[in-house]
Amino acid sequence: MYKVYGTRICLYCDKAENLLKTKDLPFEKIYIDEDDDAKDYIVKQGFKTVPQIWLDDNWIGGYDDLV
């Protein structure tokens, strides 16, 4: 399953979600602006932008990497 870490106001987060929906791929969207633990995880990984996307335990990258 894909995990998309993003924020509520993020064009590329929405694009990633729409792409996964279009391809009928299962995903979970995690809003780091509402979940402090998720935000801490992303910050500790060194990421400064969203979306950050994983497939199972494998990091994919951002939207451009997903495409």
Q: Can you say where each PLM-predicted feature lies in the sequence?
A:
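Local sequence-structure signature of Cys/Sec-based thiol-disulfide redox active-site neighborhoods
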Residues: M1-E28
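ATP-grasp fold ATP-binding core
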Residues: P51-Q52
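Thioredoxin-like thiol-disulfide oxidoreductase module
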Residues: Y31-K48
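Short, flexible helix/strand-to-coil boundary loops that buttress conserved ligand/catalytic motifs
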Residues: E17, G46, Y63-D64
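Non-catalytic, surface beta->alpha helical segment in thiol-disulfide oxidoreductase systems
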Residues: L55-V67
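Loop/helix-junction capping segments adjacent to catalytic residues or to phosphate/diphosphate-binding pockets
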Residues: C13, D36, I60
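Residue-level recognition of oxygen-bearing side chains
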Residues: K15, D37, D65
